[in-house]
């Protein structure tokens, strides 16, 4: 394990920029569907005859290409959007069919019902299960027994992938992420849209200079609920006022925040951000896994970032998923235990034992944190407590 004290906390930089693609953004929908399908398949394997997570990866999900026209108070569906679940997935175990098309379809439909609630499967959106079993490894995706799933007993790093995570969130990151979360009601078992006239394809962008944070939020209104341009502008003004108050509360005096909502919707050549069903997949936009938020729910250009997207990857052995979650857990634990900002970097050579990672780097700010021995012991203890796939079988909507 390597420990260094060379990190400059991002909140100490003169400029900081952070972005979040909301839950209804095409890329975020693709990430979420991929993860939902992977976890549904993993649970089915663990609860069924295999008793272990079988080989699969569905980290190439595609969504988009719909066509809906909209106008004040109405819309017309011309072509449904499509969800294409690309990847590979074990189709049978010991000769018994696992029903993977049903698993893919039902998992995607459940996810869409939460985060794209105005879409109707079979009407405005179509789900195409497309996972194959193509490989040059005999029985890899049609195992006759767990002897054909060697990683079930001896998990090894499936790839040489570097994953990095950070804690805590900076004040800017906190405002940007939580501002989009504020458009949802989190009081139940699953989140629900807070406003019935607001779509889910939201983007929040923050630019901080010194302690001044400018936030731009792009928030779609649903066309069926908008009677006119004047009504649109009035609703946007109300949303802007409400989000400004939420941003001020989130900043808690640490930043001076200015919030704009849909700034292109007034003046000459204005453009309204108005959608029929709440996501730009309805107007030709497309989303694929790995183009959006990192595991922490943000796009942070000024922080090191994992090159692997974890969404849809096998939770039993894929380094790009396991190390991403483990790095974030370690960063959170170090911050919670010692009250210091840190970055955690993890990697292992392909084929080496998955846990613990072969290479661990903990980076702290100069002069901060415990001694190297105490920190090493703590990190090793936390790594030993990490369970695969058990700690990765819950889809976390909120960080």
Where are these regions (language model features)?
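N-terminal, Lys/Arg- and Ser/Thr-rich interaction peptides
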Residues: 1-18, 142-156, 210-219, 292-306
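N-terminal, positively charged regions that mediate nucleic acid binding
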Residues: 1-53
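Internal helix-turn-beta structural module
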Residues: 335-399
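Glycine-rich, mobile lid/loop segments that gate access to catalytic sites or pores
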Residues: 106-247, 251-252, 257-265
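A short, glycine/Asx- and small/polar-enriched loop/turn
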Residues: 77, 209-213, 267-271, 353-359
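Short, hydrophobic beta-strand segments
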Residues: 18-20, 81-88, 213-226, 307-313, ...
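Long, well-ordered mid-to-C-terminal structural blocks that present hydrophobic/aromatic surfaces
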Residues: 237-304, 313-336
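Glycine-rich, N-terminal phosphate-binding loop and its surrounding beta-alpha-beta segment
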Residues: 43, 47-122
